């Protein structure tokens, strides 16, 4: 996979994603120390409840934190990060604002499952459920982003104006605003705030 690295941040993201191919780096993003440490400890803590060995999990799985801090990179580069984790069992850890995007990637990619990290959720139980391969489409209770909404989110994230998006998508400006409003309702946030 080749990344076009125009900025140092792109280089950092590339290095973090390439780390995932090494067996000792199975949690992305490793630069989020609290998430990395917390999830590592949680996986060790639930060891007796999962069918696979910890070594197999470290080797075959990638756990991705879809936090609002990193959503911009995931939206703008979804083909790249999905290619980077090809062949791995990908588990998305989704906060409330990223649930609809996680569901979109689950439906449209080879994602093993989604752990919804809401405040009232039992993350241990959900993590065991996904690792053990029991997460199914019927488990998705929340909305998912549609293909058209995702295209509009990507173009908005790139700084494109609704009029330009309408031309590219061959639709009216009103339709662009409607899709954007629908996506924002599912994301519980304005798109521009998520992709800053």
From Swiss-Prot:
Residue ranges flagged as DNA-binding region: 162-181
Induction / repression: Negatively regulated by H-NS. Positively autoregulated. Also positively regulated by IHF.
Key words, A-Z: Activator, Cytoplasm, DNA-binding, Repressor, Transcription, Transcription regulation
GO terms under cellular component: cytoplasm; transcription regulator complex
Pfam families tied to this protein: GerE
Keyword Nucleus: no
Domain of life: Bacteria
Domain HTH luxR-type: 138-196
Gene Ontology MF terms in the entry: DNA binding
Location(s) in or outside the cell: Cytoplasm
GO terms (BP aspect): regulation of bacterial-type flagellum-dependent cell motility; regulation of DNA-templated transcription
Impact noted for substituting residue 179 to P: Slightly increases motility
Family that this chain belongs to: Belongs to the EcpR/MatA family.
Cited function: Part of the ecpRABCDE operon, which encodes the E.coli common pilus (ECP). ECP is found in both commensal and pathogenic strains and plays a dual role in early-stage biofilm development and host cell recognition. Positively regulates the expression of the ecp operon. Also represses expression of the flagellar master operon flhDC, and consequently prevents flagellum biosynthesis and motility. Acts by binding to the regulatory region of the flhDC operon.
Misc. remarks from the entry: Expressed in strain K12.
Protein name: HTH-type transcriptional regulator EcpR
Organism: Escherichia coli (strain K12)
Phylogenetic classification of the source organism: Bacteria, Pseudomonadati, Pseudomonadota, Gammaproteobacteria, Enterobacterales
